[in-house]
Amino acid sequence: MILRTNDMRSNIGFVVIGRNEGSRLIDCLESIKKFAPAIVYVDSASTDQSVHEALTRGVHVLELDMMTKFTAARARNAGFSMLLKLYPELSYVHFADGDCIVNESWVEDAISFLEQHPQVAVTCGRRRERFPEASTYNQLCDIEWNTPVGKAKACGGDAMMRVSVFQQVKGFNAHLIAGEEPELCI
């Protein structure tokens, strides 16, 4: 079953995490707002205008308490909880880092894939460095992210997941400072 745009918009929510992302966050939010109104931005004590920029775009914002250690897993879990309180009917959640742009065709492709493969819990695409030529580090990131296409044992931080399965496994392990996505997929 292929979802029509209106069905898709009511079925999916986004959790975006970040800290001091600046214009990268603006680009991220602009790339996803056309797909769904259900967007939560989780901010980890930004000192720039990230929170203001998200609010200006009509995005729900959750500012994490600085008394507890920041981790991507903690931020994603908190954002997911807020998202479901606001939009309890969602079938899919897309997690994204605030410095990432979601490709125009990705969301519909991801939902279509999950609809056609009910045994699959999560799908992710090819993450690309926006400016691989800018530095050796950027180039190495782009090379590292060039993972094989097809069935995988794990996903990265930018992925579409079934809400029911994410709830069933009780989210990411918030105690991990990194690698929470592969651990979730075990």
Regions found by a protein language model. Give the residues of each.
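Conserved donor NDP-sugar-binding/catalytic core segment of glycosyltransferases
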Residues: I101-T136
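A conserved acidic beta->alpha catalytic loop
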Residues: S31, D43-H52, M66, C100
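A recurrent flexible, glycine/aromatic-enriched loop bordering the glycosyltransferase active site
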Residues: E129-R130, E144-M161, I177, E183
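Short beta-strand-to-loop acidic/aromatic patch adjacent to the donor-nucleotide binding site
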Residues: Y87-I101
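Short, well-formed alpha-helical segments that are part of the catalytic scaffolds
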Residues: R19-F35
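A short, conserved alpha-helix in the catalytic core of glycosyltransferases
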Residues: V165-K170, H175-I186
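Acidic helix N-cap motif at the loop->helix transition within catalytic regions
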Residues: R24-D27, D48-R57, E63
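Glycine-rich, basic loop-to-helix element that forms the pyrophosphate-binding segment
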Residues: M66-K85
